[in-house]
């Protein structure tokens, strides 16, 4: 899930004519950067067209001290000869992607950070993602038990030079939630936020 902190119309669809956004083809539509601590070691999990891929997890701490656990996938070629151990601090560059996985005869949307580069680092924790895509389901607006405004959207993000899209669930809060709630399916937006893994407990009435 992406928690968004900024949202803007892309002028290819609608919006202020003075906003001067670049077109989808002129910019990357999916950019993510994370600094965190390895909490699960890389292991080879699958192979595609002869190239092996490794999965691992990185823990990223927020200013509030809450922690997000981010699943990461990286190719063996991108990993190279680098070796990592639990507790290593790493800097990751890549994209936030999705794929469907069959679980109990049902398709489940799996989200992961696809790393194109990894390095050891002493930098502070970082969790940034920027997406440009299309709203592909009607936004769902609601209020939390603490009366905070929230809106869920599913964003289709096209991969450049690839006939595939990543479907990314996003959460917006406050004025951003109000802004996006009335937008229609097919609206293109530019978003900026963070990857969020914290599990929420839903409060039910007796």
Please name every model-derived segment.
Residues 4-206:
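Single-stranded nucleic acid-binding surfaces, predominantly the OB-fold ssDNA-binding core
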């Amino acid at each position: 899930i992406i928690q968004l902190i900024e949202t803007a119309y892309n002028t290819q669809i609608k919006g202020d004519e003075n906003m001067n956004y670049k077109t989808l083809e002129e910019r990357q539509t999916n950019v993510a950067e994370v600094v965190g601590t390895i909490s699960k070691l890389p292991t080879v999990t699958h192979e595609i067209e002869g190239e092996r891929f490794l999965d691992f997890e990185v823990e990223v701490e927020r200013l509030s001290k809450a922690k997000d656990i981010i699943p990461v996938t990286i190719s063996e070629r991108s990993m190279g000869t680098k070796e990592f151990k639990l507790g290593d601090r790493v800097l990751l560059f890549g994209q936030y992607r999705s794929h469907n996985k069959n679980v109990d005869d049902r398709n489940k949307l799996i989200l992961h950070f696809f790393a194109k580069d990894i390095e050891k680092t002493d930098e502070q924790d970082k969790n940034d993602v920027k997406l440009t895509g299309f709203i592909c389901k009607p936004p769902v607006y609601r209020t939390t038990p603490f009366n905070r405004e929230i809106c869920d959207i599913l964003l289709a993000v096209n991969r450049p030079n690839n006939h595939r899209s990543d479907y990314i669930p996003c959460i917006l809060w406050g004025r951003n939630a109000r802004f996006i709630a009335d937008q229609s399916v097919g609206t293109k937006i530019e978003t900026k936020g963070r990857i969020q893994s914290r599990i929420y407990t839903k409060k039910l009435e007796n």
